[in-house]
């Protein structure tokens, strides 16, 4: 019997029952104007592509991810999202050699934010330099160190992803999570929540902190991959996506893979909330910072889901409708992705 290709997919409502509400930083509009003007002034894309890039509203992502940060710190968050997604557009089509060169440039800029960049260098160097030269001024020393370390881990994983792409490698589910926990960029993003904090190293080493971070990272992966799969599969670029990974590993169809995503998401949700409600105490001053950080982790889940539907990146102008109806037509012809995905 010939199995026909489905024409629609159902998107599970993974936000159902999540106790953290969608919240937007009060400095969103002001920061959006400043950050978009800044990235546009560096000309990472031509005018047409830059317009599409701005339509994705990465400042909204930052403003929902960091709703309680100060004006200076939310600007750092917005600029980080610009760096992330410009790098993503460049590296998604890069060879291993080119990806490694980009990584070396960006890391040199982050380690030496006051050093002028060579005029003939990839623009990523100047973007990273200006981002961190401004951001490090208002970051605590521990948070700055942790951010740079985590960002290096993210960059190295992108080279690993390029290697997979060159060799047409489809990972096992476990192998996929090993690299995806890095390529999703969650850890450096979490580090920005610490910009004004001074949480001792012994606290970071507590298992509860790691469990919460991993649970949220995995939920972000599941939601991001579930919501971006349709666009990615339409251009044959879904090898680095949990939906495709599960379909291959379990020899199943997209509907069953989506159900797998939903079930695992529910397990992660319960695990996170159990740990969140039983975090150890380290004294009033540290506890207040830990609570703020843990709340920020929980907020990242709803932030990621909300932005995915509200921006133009994955669903164009149809995001709000699709979020309500949960059904989307499977794309069956090549489309442009990333900043060129929609005409919104």
Swiss-Prot record:
The protein in question is named Sesquiterpene synthase 9
Motif DDXXD motif at which residues? 88-92
Q: Which top-level group of life is the source organism from?
A: Eukaryota
Instruction: Tell me the function of this protein.
Output: Terpene cyclase that catalyzes the cyclization of farnesyl diphosphate (FPP) to a single major sesquiterpene scaffold whose chemical structure is still unknown.
Question: Which UniProt keyword terms apply here?
Answer: Lyase, Magnesium, Metal-binding
Q: Which organism is it from?
A: Postia placenta (strain ATCC 44394 / Madison 698-R)
GO MF entry, a single one: terpene synthase activity
Listed binding positions for (2E,6E)-farnesyl diphosphate are 313-314
Q: Where is this motif: NSE/DTE motif?
A: 224-232
Q: Which GO terms describe its biological process?
A: isoprenoid biosynthetic process
Residues the record annotates as the site (Plays a critical role in the stabilization of intermediate cation) are: 85
Q: Which residues bind Mg(2+) 3 per the record? A: 224, 228, 232
Pfam families annotated for this entry? Terpene_syn_C_2 (PF19086)
